A protein has these predicted regions:
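Conserved ATP-binding N-box helix of the HATPase_c
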Residues: 32-51, 59, 133-159, 203-208
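Conserved signal-transmission helix
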Residues: 16-30
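Glycine-rich/acidic phosphate-handling loop/turn and adjacent ATP-lid/helix
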Residues: 166-199
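Short beta-strand/loop element within the Bergerat-fold HATPase_c
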Residues: 156-168
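Short acidic helix/loop segment immediately C-terminal to the autophosphorylated histidine
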Residues: 57-63
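Conserved short strand/loop->alpha-helix "switch" segment adjacent to the catalytic nucleotide/phosphoryl-transfer site
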Residues: 26-33, 118-146, 150, 191-194
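Conserved DHp (HisKA) dimerization/phosphotransfer helix of two-component histidine kinases, i.e.
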Residues: 65-119
């Protein structure tokens, strides 16, 4: 048993065999799904930018104008952080190299979850670089676990490269954890029927692991702590 797995209390994890007989989805379908997810996530900070600009145009009080500028800065930062994360997790971020700097992945996660201060990030990755597929899988698992912390909490993210394999583990703990059953099913089996935009990360994580010849692990739905992991060939 690896260092990462034992650190994340792997004894309570149940292994789920990846089922590759899920409903097929072509590239156009997935592109549409992903675009819907990105638009949904960017709507709030971009909308706040628009509101801030409108307020600034009508406001003459110096103090209120200063607050408008602060709102604009916060919204612009949130938008940029989301785009940086999505580029690495969903797109071709990291260039065309086979491996990606893990520090870039850490910075992307810190930018995504660190702004509001609701989620505290623990980074347990010692390797300076990991394969691009492993980084994408780790980020998508982290996104799912972080979103499940509806009232905030602790999100620990770990990875370990061993001989012949790479082990990834994400642990979420907080006052309320909610991983939607649809997301859980999509993550474990690839889903069935029409996949919703909110399940884009789960669908991608499932297929990233499956195409790499790996397995996915999930903690029991009744557990007080959410743990998601994967083991893929190095």
């Amino acid at each position: 048993m690896g260092i990462v797995t034992s650190r994340f209390n792997a004894g309570s994890l149940r292994q789920i065999k990846l089922c590759l007989i899920a409903a097929p989805m072509n590239a156009v379908d997935f592109a549409s799904l992903l675009c819907s997810r990105l638009c949904h996530d960017l709507m709030s900070p971009v909308g706040a930018l628009n509101n801030g600009i409108e307020l600034l145009a009508d406001e003459t009080d110096p103090e209120m104008r200063e607050k408008c500028l602060e709102l604009l800065a916060d919204s612009a930062r949130a938008t940029a952080n989301k785009l940086k994360f999505f580029r690495l997790a969903f797109g071709a971020g990291g260039g065309f190299a086979d491996e990606i700097d893990t520090g870039e992945a850490q910075a992307a996660l810190e930018g995504l979850f660190g702004g509001e201060g609701k989620v505290q990030l623990g980074w347990v990755v010692s390797d300076e670089k990991l394969p691009k597929g492993a980084i994408k899988l780790l980020l998508n698992l982290s996104l799912l676990a972080g979103d499940a912390l509806v009232r905030g909490g602790q999100l620990d993210v770990g990875a370990e490269r061993r001989t012949g394999e790479i082990e990834l583990a994400v642990r979420a703990e907080g006052p309320r954890i909610l991983l939607d059953p649809v997301l859980r099913q999509t993550l474990a089996t690839g889903g069935s029927g029409t996949i919703e935009p909110r399940a884009a990360a789960a669908w991608l994580a499932h297929h990233l692991a499956g195409e790499a010849g790996g397995t996915i692990k999930l903690s029991d739905p009744t557990s007080d702590v959410l743990m998601i992991g994967a083991v893929i060939p190095a």
